[in-house]
Amino acid sequence: MLVQITALAFLAGIASAGVVVGGYGDGVGVGLGGLGGGLGGVGVGLGGVGVVGGGHGVVDLHTPAHYQFKYGVEDHRTGDRKQQAEVRVGDVVKGEYSLAEPDGTVRVVKYTADDHNGFNAVVSRVGHAVHPQVLVRKAVVPVATHGVVGVGGLGGLGGVGLGGVGLGGVGLGGGLGGVGLLGGRGGLDRGILGGHGGSELKFKRALI
């Protein structure tokens, strides 16, 4: 209260002296603001002391830790099934969790942990493993019959030539399974103009 009266008396003295210059007026305003801020700071400090003093009687740092939790997930769309539970009393933790494996079994893990023994876990499986059946597909190779110039092989490596039909096509100079136009060594077919072939002898006779 005394500070407020002093501040009012100070302002009245300045007003009667006729000091109206902007620079001086601003300086006085800043000074009074600083004085008010200082008083506010003292109030905040006292409040802080009260909070700290009240906190000493609430916190006990020697109380043993204690908690427990449990949760589970069961998703029928994705097949995800799992659960976990854990309890801690002081420095000893005990827990268990389980989850569904892809082979149809359930893995169960029971664990304990403390300062003396460390972490120990026992893992077990429940149920019988079901392995998915593997499908074996047999490859079917179509056999080419005949074409304009020659007969393609049963999957030869000849390039496409003058209108052959088949998987191998007609090779220009022979090949592994294609018909040779200029001879060469055909793997499965007869060369048209000579060379060695495997099976298509009647084709040359038909052309001659």
Curated annotation (Swiss-Prot):
Signal peptide: 1-17
PROSITE patterns to which the protein is assigned, alphabetical: CHIT_BIND_RR_1, CHIT_BIND_RR_2
Sequence repeat ranges, renumbered to this chain: 34-43, 171-180
Record GO terms (molecular function): structural constituent of cuticle
KW Repeat (keyword) present: yes
Annotated keywords: Cuticle, Repeat, Signal
Highest taxon of the lineage: Eukaryota
Matching Pfam families: Chitin_bind_4 (PF00379)
Keyword Signal: yes
Start and end residues of each Chitin-binding type R&R domain: 64-135
Region (2 X 10 AA repeats): 34-180
Tissue: Epidermal regions synthesizing hard cuticle.
A GO CC term assigned to this protein in UniProt: extracellular matrix
Cited function: Cuticular proteins play a significant role in determining the physical properties of cuticles.
Protein name according to UniProt: Adult-specific cuticular protein ACP-20
Protein's organism: Tenebrio molitor (Yellow mealworm beetle)
Lineage: Eukaryota, Metazoa, Ecdysozoa, Arthropoda, Hexapoda
